[in-house]
Amino acid sequence: MKALITGASSGIGRDMAKILSKKGYDLVLVARDEEKLQEVKKEIETNTQIIIMDLSVEKNCKKLYEQVKDVDLLINNAGFGTCGDFTKTNLDKEINMINTNITAYHILTKLYLKDMKQKDKGQILNVASIAGFMPGPLMATYYATKAYVVRLSEAIREELKKEKSNVKISILCPGPVDTNFNNVADVEFSIKGLSSKYVAKYAIKKLEKNKFYIVPGFSIKCAKIGAKIAPTGLVSKISYKMQKRKIK
């Protein structure tokens, strides 16, 4: 069995790699930080290939697909966020985020899904966020990218069900997690985040059961339900207050 994990140099990606290695998976780990990837590789027992690559560049996503074939499990995990008033956040950084959080997911999901459907086996885990179920004032672009991942995955899931395919797709939708995401986005969560180890362990456990929505943490499950049943305006107001509190 072979798993391809993007954003594997730290946080959830790193911890999922360790768990899958213990389950016997050979791994292909992708990230931009070679030093951190080498550190992860040292901690893994099974056959591991590391690829240093910036997935915000479209041609690199296609290049990765050409380099790595016969993937049993694809985990799209690379991503980052920005925080601030929409008119004041850096446009270039946001475009880079859209390319990483959306375009890379879209390309890799499409290319590897085609192969998996031909073999009628395989699994894809798209790492989204609870943010994908609600508006996110002061983190507008990030929330929108995660909404794309959620809706794309939901649509693909239905297509696979209608085709009676054995290929499975899932989305991981955590809330705050103690990772480097906070430093990159320049935010500090007002509630304590879950550990990346817990989220990774929970995700793999649910993935093995073919769970589609993987939502770690009771409070985050409640937030997902609340976002669905509450008026959008109310959800936006609550979201705004939460974002305002966590801007450094």
Locations of regions flagged by a protein language model:
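Conserved NAD(P)H cofactor-binding loop of Rossmann-fold oxidoreductase domains
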Residues: 77-82
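Residue(s) in the substrate-gating loop at a strand-loop-helix junction
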Residues: 129
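C-terminal helical subdomain
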Residues: 171, 188-224
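Conserved glycine-rich cofactor-binding loop
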Residues: 9-10
